[in-house]
Amino acid sequence: MNKAVHYLGRYSASEQRLREVLGRFAKRKLADTEPAKVASATNNVVEKCLRLGYIDDAAFAANQARGQRRQGKSTLAIRQRLRQHALGDAAITMALQTADANHQDAEMMAAIRFARRRRLGPFFNGVPDERTRHRHMGSLARAGFSMAICRTVLDTNSIDDLEELERDAGHSGQPGE
């Protein structure tokens, strides 16, 4: 239990991730112990952590989705990342809805943030040519953005226009925003 609490004190983790960490620890420290006993002890610790609220896959997924969205990750990239943590599709969908709740077009906002971070499209400092445009298009597409969003970001002429588009995409029309 100490190892689990120490790990969860340092890192946010899903149930599956905690199982993996405890399994590796047990394999390293308890090599002579029966695997069935180790698995049982690991399950007991994980169940106790769940009961005490130390791990919550829904909250973990929501926090990860919000953080990834702020970094400019596409919905596809966020889904793949959360699947690596062995989270179910329902939890992932709910996390994405929570992360995108206050934004009209969160995918567009994420694409603009990605372009800004990678200096693509209007954020590019050099002289844009056709080859550069193809490279930028490929970079956005590999990041999981649709071709329509890629074209919109790259076809915008100025940074000011793109920032206005980002503000429009972020406004949900709800009072208080």
Please place each PLM-identified region on the residue numbering.
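An alpha-helical, amphipathic repeat domain used for nucleic-acid recognition
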Residues: M1-E177
